[in-house]
């Protein structure tokens, strides 16, 4: 008997709906990354994308512990000399709350083409509305 290897064509990918309201950012991101990789499935294969599609709603109501709202900083560089832009977690949640979850999850996925493919299956929305009703996502309680 040989070791089982999942094939990209035969992998069953489901759609799940996750409500981020009141969830801790890091704990939620860890579970989302695990499910995007497919590590919760018995057919998990490291070099094949076996993960599911995840629709996250209420990103604006995510919770953090301690003083991270003021202390946690996000940095981005515009490409021009001296233009390193910095904003706190509180400012980031005001401007673009969905990006906070996306950045946290992206850092937990593999770097490279396979990780980018897994990341594309994550859909994050600030409010309760999302355009994926046609996929009939199942509610996932994390």
UniProtKB/Swiss-Prot annotation:
Belongs to the universal ribosomal protein uL13 family. This protein is one of the early assembly proteins of the 50S ribosomal subunit, although it is not seen to bind rRNA by itself. It is important during the early stages of 50S assembly. GO terms for biological process: negative regulation of translation; translation. CDD domains: Ribosomal_L13. InterPro entries: Ribosomal_uL13, Ribosomal_uL13_bac-type, Ribosomal_uL13_CS, Ribosomal_uL13_sf. It comes from Stenotrophomonas maltophilia (strain K279a). Signal peptide: none annotated. GO terms for molecular function: mRNA binding; structural constituent of ribosome. The keyword Ribonucleoprotein applies. Keywords: Ribonucleoprotein, Ribosomal protein. The gene is rplM. Part of the 50S ribosomal subunit. NCBIfam families: rplM_bact. GO terms for cellular component: cytosolic large ribosomal subunit. The keyword Repeat does not apply. This is Large ribosomal subunit protein uL13.
